């Protein structure tokens, strides 16, 4: 019995402390599903957040394309009442990998995306509680985003994402630029 225990300990030690083999990552044709979310416009209010879902595919030279949808909710204060701006956007973009570690566990990418969507202010209700009327209304949006993203492989099929993003959307009535800080999870499906 003691001999079996020592052989088990030796096998585990060899498995843990010998060189590791990593699965191939960032191969052309690999695809993943992303779930992401975070803070929008800083973390000034509890209602300033975004969430989204995307599909990404890897190309030659370890770059990738992204197509997805996002929901952003931002809070504006008016006389101690929240006026909400909600944006529903679709995204199509391309990310260039410019840094990775030798073990292919960490990847840093920069990307640009085209965005199109719809914005609603105070869910279409233009009359405020005190009788004043909102000048900002619902509108269609168009623009783009610049993203810096860090990908960390937790396993060969599960990836943790961290990103900083600046969105510029025209057509709305409440400002053009929105900064986002977020985390995400990507599942490699192919």
Question: Where in the sequence are the language-model features?
Answer:
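Short glycine/proline- and aromatic-enriched beta-strand/turn motifs that initiate or cap beta-hairpins
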Residues: 21-74, 182, 186-190
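Predominantly the C-terminal beta-signal and adjacent terminal strand-loop region
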Residues: 72-74, 144-190
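Residues that define the transmembrane beta-barrel architecture of outer-membrane proteins
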Residues: 29-31, 45-51, 82-90, 106, ...
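Polar/charged side chains located within well-ordered beta-strands of beta-rich proteins
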Residues: 35-37, 63-67, 92-96, 149, ...
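Cleavable N-terminal export/targeting peptides
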Residues: 1-28
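Extracellular loop and loop/strand-boundary signature of outer-membrane beta-barrel proteins
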Residues: 38-41, 76-83, 130-136, 168-172
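Outer-envelope beta-barrel architecture signal
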Residues: 24-33, 61-65, 104-110, 140, ...
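Gram-negative (and chloroplast) outer-membrane scaffold detector with strong preference
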Residues: 54-129, 187-190
């Amino acid at each position: 019995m003691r001999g079996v225990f020592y052989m088990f300990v030796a096998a585990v030690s060899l498995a843990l402390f010998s060189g590791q083999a990593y699965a191939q990552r960032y191969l052309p044709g690999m695809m993943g599903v992303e779930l992401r979310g975070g803070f929008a416009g800083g973390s000034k209010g509890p209602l300033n957040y975004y969430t989204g879902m995307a599909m990404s595919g890897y190309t030659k030279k370890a770059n990738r394309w992204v197509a997805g949808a996002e929901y952003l909710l931002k809070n504006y204060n008016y006389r101690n009442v929240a006026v909400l701006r909600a944006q529903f956007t679709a995204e199509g973009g391309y990310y260039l990998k410019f840094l990775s570690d030798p073990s292919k566990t960490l990847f840093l990418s920069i990307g640009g995306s085209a965005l199109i969507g719809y914005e609603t202010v105070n869910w279409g209700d233009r009359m405020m509680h005190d009788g004043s009327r909102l000048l900002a209304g619902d509108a269609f949006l168009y623009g783009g985003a610049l993203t810096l993203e860090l990908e960390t492989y937790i396993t060969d099929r599960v990836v943790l994402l961290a990103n900083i993003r600046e969105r510029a959307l025209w057509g709305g009535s409440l400002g053009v630029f929105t900064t986002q800080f977020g985390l995400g999870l990507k599942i490699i499906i192919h």
